[in-house]
């Protein structure tokens, strides 16, 4: 592992540290948004993060719950970073990372065994935004649906989450109609949607979705989140998430 490409930084103000690599996909505001969006209760015992990267979402969630958190990561370097991040934060008894394609889930998990499944997946289809297809394969896999597409992600999530369990997704707002159709295809009912805007003058860029497996019909559109003020600084609502 090339440590010249690595940096060790504080993870916001959450008394956590994270190792990142400049040639790999580093955590973004999306990871924080979905981590804060997830509804955690005393009945939440087991969580799965699909495409966990360097385990930033499990790290965030560990500050909010004592539930066991599992992450699946297909890229070896990201997997190794995830293990080290768990170790330096002394979370080896709470967070567990699996190095494999999540399509092989039956090797590791029982169907219907998770209270919550969540993901911050690749946002782009392979045929979209080809200018973002990077010479570095690891970045292409993180941004484009090279290894796992939206349909496969939601199908697998439906199999792994328990009946009436929760699925959380952060994705591009302009793919919302496709997401909602696919959720229903695999027996999820969307329950909450929150649109996120980079600034109040722009269209929504990101959407956060909560769905319940075999849930009742009834969708709430939550108040929007504006990420940046006009001067480019984070809004107070986002800054509170940093704490």
Where are these regions (language model features)?
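Short, structurally constrained coil/turn elements
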Residues: 12, 91, 184-187, 221
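Short glycine/threonine-rich catalytic loop with a Thr-x-Gly-x-Asp
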Residues: 23-27, 51-54, 201-202
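Class I SAM-dependent transferase core
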Residues: 2-41
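Conserved Class I SAM-dependent methyltransferase catalytic core
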Residues: 146-204
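Conserved SAM/SAH cofactor-binding pocket of Class I
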Residues: 36-130, 155
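Mobile active-site "lid"/loop adjacent to the S-adenosyl-L-methionine
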Residues: 122-152
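SAM/dcSAM-binding transferase cores
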Residues: 203-243
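General small-molecule cofactor/ligand-binding pocket signal
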Residues: 19, 96-98, 191-194
